[in-house]
């Protein structure tokens, strides 16, 4: 493993070097090390991964710690950073093994002697906190080793730059490791720690600005896109302590331009402008005008504005970039919903929203923004208002027409919120019908296969039930077949008409005076319910009420029977089907003779189906056993 790993790390190919680093990281990630592969019963031994004896483990960890020290002092910045990060991440895990502690301390000292190891200092402090401070009231807790206290003092940042690297320019979230005197108690402990660390970052920024240090000493970390949450406060501190704001601004921009484009984060710039605004607002406006012209800062222009006061002048500055082809519309989303933008005239916000719809993916930005605006607002309040509701449903129509792919369902959530807020209030009647027509136009186009935006479609059916049901049975024969397929549910996809109240379904079916629609609508009703893990499966009350209201219960029961077989399952399919069959079998004793008679006939067919399925599974199992023999 060491030979292969070293070959990868020494490779000229970036992907192989990354693979070598990952091998090094996983080598220190156990035990246990879990094996991957086929573990089914058979003639081969199962692979449970490497399970070393204690002596083997010590030898293993010694070898890989030596490699980490070699890489961490190699003089190659990329390798040094990776090695130092890995050992910091694994320090607390490795410290549990007493026989390796002296090796671990020696490695920490070597890395720190090469250059200050702030990540290691935080790793040591978190080890002290979790293994000792947090467990101080436990009887079986190990006394705090003096050698660990000594190591913590040795690794603690002693100069300004190393302190900034540890407190500000590090992506580790060891809140408990950064303030030894803080009592980590109470429901607000993390927000309190954040306040302390923000104040610390501001102070460090001020001290750095008044010092003789240059910004190049903090790069590239100062602008790395790597989740360092205190750089805004650090930027504020820089502005607060800068002897000359203009000159320091120019130095910041120069250092930003020297960094690789893909790695740039402008949080420090944002903090600098925000503090400048509190010192000299006219200068802050001048800096923002420069940002609008900068090749990189223009992409973050909205976020660079001080949030305490966002004016129409600021909006004009931001919107002046909107028609540029390389500007992403996501930058503007917060303006539509954020409290810090609430002082803007409604007409200007509507203008922005309307223009966003003409941008690529602008419809998604509008939907997500309006969803955020609706967050935590009561359903009875018309938060959006007529104009924003019009834009919101237009965004939904535009996005749904474009494609119906929504991996993860996040956009479906946003669209469902906007559609719900639009359909529940009067007005927008033309847009509501256009939205409904769009749904079925897309259904027709995709032959009834729509597996995204289920919640948005479902809430539409709930608010416009009669119109929704009527659309299913409108159109040509081909269109009706596609739409009936669309409402037919299975175990993995709920039918949109399942969101419609069963009383409305029954009333609508009765008004059509067409007995055949009952069976079609029945295909979308949720059938099975279960009170607890040990309780038997039974028909849902809504399904039973629909069956009892139907003029032809046999046809409805036949549809129910089609949903006895699961669309996916683990183990025996017959075992999944059996309790569902028994749920239908309970209807044999129904008080109505027509339902009882129909249930008996359907139950007999289903019982035969289950027996055939059991036989098929038995033959399949025998074949597998013979193959093993």
Cite the ranges covered by each PLM segment.
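Non-catalytic all-alpha helical scaffold/repeat segments
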Residues: 1-629
